[in-house]
Amino acid sequence: MSAQPVDLQIFGRSLRVNCPPEQRDALNQAAEDLNQRLQDLKERTRVTNTEQLVFIAALNISYELTQEKAKTRDYASSMEQRIRMLQQTIEQALLEQGRISEKPGSKFE
């Protein structure tokens, strides 16, 4: 489906962007989040220049994204390591089971 125009209000300014209908709710939520961040930043920093606030917010969001990407990479690496360890454990168990079942007189059912 094609993108549709969506009107947003961010920090007292109107903005019209095109957005696929299935992403409209996520876009509105992102706009609300950005608006809240800008309001909070204005109160915390006492900066009144809107452009400066937007740049600070963008840097904060970029930093958070970088941190989340690092967490995801670390988690994926940890999972890969665990999978390799499980695979080795299973392979070792299968080898040992093969050795046991090859001994005369041992039967497993």
Curated annotation (Swiss-Prot):
UniProt keyword annotation of Transferase present: no
InterPro entries to which the protein is assigned, alphabetical: Cell_div_ZapA-like (IPR007838), Cell_div_ZapA-like_sf (IPR036192), Cell_div_ZapA_eubact (IPR023771), Cell_div_ZapA_N (IPR042233)
Keyword DNA-binding: no
Compartment list: Cytoplasm
Pfam families: ZapA (PF05164)
Coiled coil regions in record: 21-99
Annotated Gene Ontology cellular component terms: cell division site; cell septum; cytosol; plasma membrane
Gene Ontology terms describing biological process: division septum assembly; FtsZ-dependent cytokinesis; septin ring assembly
Domain of life of the native organism: Bacteria
UniProt keyword annotations, A-Z: Cell cycle, Cell division, Coiled coil, Cytoplasm, Septation
Function statement: Activator of cell division through the inhibition of FtsZ GTPase activity, therefore promoting FtsZ assembly into bundles of protofilaments necessary for the formation of the division Z ring. It is recruited early at mid-cell but it is not essential for cell division.
Alphabetical list of NCBIfam families matching this protein: PRK10972.1
Assembly information from the UniProt record: Homodimer. Interacts with FtsZ.
Protein family per UniProt: Belongs to the ZapA family. Type 1 subfamily.
Family annotation (HAMAP family): ZapA_type1
Name of the protein: Cell division protein ZapA
Taxonomic path: Bacteria, Pseudomonadati, Pseudomonadota, Gammaproteobacteria, Enterobacterales
